């Protein structure tokens, strides 16, 4: 490599001109991982545990990835997710909103939906049905079970576990 190219490669890029450009910058994997887990502390407990386990498994699975394009795509998508969570759970004045605000995500963009493969659409459909009762209170679930003539069974309750 020529010395001029080497100097160009080592030169730092220009500073971002706006906040939106600064937020697009990538964060190294370990600080990003820690910030994601820290942001999940503001979610409701069940959402936090689900999010934490998903983040941990995804980072664990991609630990051995060598392809720079995959790494950049992975880090940029997680950074966008982090920005989305932080913007919806932290007030503009910097104070945390805490448990009072429930984060429900956002609607799936039609352009992104059209890019999904048939297998991914099937997985999304299964996820939709698996999570349809997430936002219902236990009382609502019990009422629906009673109206259907089914006794609600809690698998963690030893008194009802064998009564199904």
UniProtKB/Swiss-Prot annotation:
- Localization per Swiss-Prot or TrEMBL: Mitochondrion matrix
A single GO cellular-component term from the record reads: mitochondrial matrix
Read off the InterPro entries from this record: SDHAF3/Sdh7
Q: Which residues fall in a compositionally biased region of kind Basic and acidic residues?
A: 136-145
Q: What does this protein do?
A: Plays an essential role in the assembly of succinate dehydrogenase (SDH), an enzyme complex (also referred to as respiratory complex II) that is a component of both the tricarboxylic acid (TCA) cycle and the mitochondrial electron transport chain, and which couples the oxidation of succinate to fumarate with the reduction of ubiquinone (coenzyme Q) to ubiquinol. Promotes maturation of the iron-sulfur protein subunit of the SDH catalytic dimer, protecting it from the deleterious effects of oxidants. May act together with SDHAF1.
Q: How does it assemble?
A: Interacts with the iron-sulfur protein subunit within the SDH catalytic dimer.
Name the keywords, alphabetized.
Chaperone, Gluconeogenesis, Mitochondrion, Transit peptide
Extent of the transit peptide: 1-51
Q: Where is the composition biased (Polar residues)?
A: 153-164
One GO term under biological process is: regulation of gluconeogenesis
Q: Where is this region: Disordered?
A: 136-164
Which protein family is it in?
Belongs to the complex I LYR family. SDHAF3 subfamily.
An example of a Pfam family matching this protein is: Complex1_LYR_2
Q: What is this protein called?
A: Succinate dehydrogenase assembly factor 3, mitochondrial
Coiled-coil residues are: none
Q: Which cysteines are joined by disulfide bonds?
A: none
